[in-house]
Regions:
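Lipid interaction determinants
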Residues: 1-51, 58-118
């Protein structure tokens, strides 16, 4: 996602979550047709964006996302575990993944989310 990703992460009191993220500088398609775009534009859009949602549960310093819908279909029905840490003021949430294959390489992702609401 680069150094300046853009996205939203939402957890509800009812136990649902949704996360979406991509680079902040995603190129626009040549057309405004949502289902249009060249094969190259579509491939780049898919390769640079993550979106999934479902249920979540917290156990100690681990949050488990039970994926019910996802842009990446292989995640549907899986559990995505992330270690988390909250800043002292509760405004920053850091999520750390186990090793994941991204772009053909195995990586550990560390995402820092900033709270935007009260």
């Amino acid at each position: 996602m680069g150094e300046a990703p853009d996205g939203l992460l939402t957890y509800t009191a009812e136990g649902t979550m949704i996360g979406i993220m991509g680079p902040g500088d995603r190129p626009r398609f040549a057309t405004d047709d949502v289902t249009g775009g060249s094969a190259e534009e579509q491939a780049q859009a898919f390769a640079t964006f993550i979106a999934y949602g479902g249920r979540y549960a917290v156990d100690g310093d681990t949050v488990t996302h039970t994926v019910e819908t996802s842009l990446f279909p292989n995640w549907i029905g899986t559990e995505q575990r992330r270690r988390f840490a909250l800043s002292d003021d509760g405004r920053m949430l850091t999520l750390t993944s186990p090793p994941l294959v991204l772009g053909g390489a195995t990586r550990i992702q560390r995402l820092v989310w900033e709270r935007v609401g009260p």
